[in-house]
């Protein structure tokens, strides 16, 4: 879609599909800072250039807006200004959550938190349905969590051996003990185990 440093002439609303947003470090390493889903805005910046890169994880459909037209519209609508403020507040909260995850949690806690975020996002839409799509690759997950692919795979195997998750086919994982997963994530008992959960690994709070 665009690269960090490109002139920010447009912003976008994601209509369909999943995007990853990322930054490239001076040494060439990629750091994924979030995943975006339908309804999210992409490329919102108070600067004249994009502050991150964005690319598709799956085929996507986007609604494109001229930055100037968007700013003019928001400037003339108190309601839209409040909505934009709420969006930016959510972005800040998500960034703070990610800082906590990377600075305070070990590998197991990070992966458990990642799985819980996907589960909770799906259950916000339909509490009775526990199937969520994760199109991002293991490398994407590793780059988002600040881990190596090997650590992600090893930790997933550990959770499987503990009976907390169970592979379902080639690209799915069933969460058998959501409360235990929440405990291992260091988040407390935020989920109930009433509904076993299936998380698909081959199809992909905001930016999670």
What do these predicted regions represent?
Residues 120-208:
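Phosphate-/nucleic-acid-contacting segments
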Residues 21-25:
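Cytochrome P450 core scaffold surrounding the K-helix E-X-X-R motif
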Residues 1-12, 16:
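Regulatory nucleotide-sensing modules
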Residues 15-16, 37, 58, 169:
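A cytosolic small-molecule/anion-sensing beta-strand core signal
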Residues 32-93, 97:
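Cyclic-nucleotide recognition modules
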Residues 75-148:
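Polybasic "coupling" helices that flank or enter modular domains
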Residues 11, 35, 64, 135, ...:
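Short aromatic/basic micro-patch
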């Amino acid at each position: 879609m665009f690269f960090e440093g490109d002139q920010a002439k447009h912003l976008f609303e994601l209509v369909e599909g999943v995007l990853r947003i990322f930054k490239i470090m001076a040494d060439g390493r990629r750091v994924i800072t979030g995943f975006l889903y339908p309804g999210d805005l992409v490329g919102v910046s108070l600067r004249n250039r994009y502050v991150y890169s964005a690319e598709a994880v799956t085929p996507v459909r986007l609604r494109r807006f001229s930055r100037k037209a968007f700013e003019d519209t928001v400037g003339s609508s108190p309601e839209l200004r409040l909505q934009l403020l709420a969006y930016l507040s959510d972005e800040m909260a998500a960034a703070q959550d990610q800082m906590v995850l990377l600075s305070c949690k070990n590998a197991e806690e990070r992966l458990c938190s990642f799985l819980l975020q996907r589960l909770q996002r799906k259950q916000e839409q339909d509490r009775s349905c526990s199937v969520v799509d994760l199109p991002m690759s293991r490398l994407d997950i590793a780059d988002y969590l600040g881990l190596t692919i090997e650590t992600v795979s090893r930790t997933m195997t550990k959770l499987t051996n503990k009976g907390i998750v169970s592979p379902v086919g080639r690209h799915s994982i069933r969460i058998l003990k959501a409360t235990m997963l929440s405990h291992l994530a260091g988040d407390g008992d935020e989920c109930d185990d009433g509904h076993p959960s299936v998380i698909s690994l081959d199809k992909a709070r905001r930016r999670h």
